[in-house]
Amino acid sequence: MPRKGPVPPREIPPDPKYGDVLVQKLINKVMKDGKKSVAEWIVYTALEEAAKEVNMHPVELLHKVIEKLKPEWEVRPRRVGGATYQVPIEVPERRQISLAIKWLVQAARERPRGRGQYTMIERLKAELLDALNERGGAYKKKEETHRMAHANMVFSHFRW
């Protein structure tokens, strides 16, 4: 922990096409080995194709998807008297967004290749549309996190 107080969060510049910070965060999460132009192409194409299917603006679509994937509660391990309890805590706004984007990209990457979903563009598009309709791997991850937190509410008095 730094001695000179809390570290201020870094400012992320908005993406060049839509001027939105959330799109830039998604691009950064999709990026592999520093290939940003490839990540931009994947994200922009997937967003545009998904938005075309549901007649929405791509940025509006992404904001709705992230809103549906943001977890309100999560569990954190807490050691009390030799036993480790899973203590539910409320998730701060910044972490909610980070987790939602992380789960979205992770679910798209883990999606099985097949049934017309071979490229990352197709898998990300499918995951975006599934999350919008409250289905898919990312939404299941959010539900699982909430279920764990709800099941462990008995230990909420151990919150710090």
UniProtKB/Swiss-Prot annotation:
The keyword Glycoprotein does not apply. It comes from the Bacteria. Keywords: Ribonucleoprotein, Ribosomal protein, RNA-binding, rRNA-binding, tRNA-binding. GO terms for cellular component: cytosolic small ribosomal subunit; ribosome. InterPro entries: Ribosomal_uS7, Ribosomal_uS7_bac/org-type, Ribosomal_uS7_CS, Ribosomal_uS7_dom, Ribosomal_uS7_dom_sf. Disulfide bonds: none annotated. The keyword Ribosomal protein applies. GO terms for molecular function: mRNA binding; rRNA binding; structural constituent of ribosome; tRNA binding. Pfam families: Ribosomal_S7 (PF00177). One of the primary rRNA binding proteins, it binds directly to 16S rRNA where it nucleates assembly of the head domain of the 30S subunit. Is located at the subunit interface close to the decoding center, probably blocks exit of the E-site tRNA. Belongs to the universal ribosomal protein uS7 family. Part of the 30S ribosomal subunit. Contacts proteins S9 and S11. This is Small ribosomal subunit protein uS7B. It comes from Aquifex aeolicus (strain VF5).
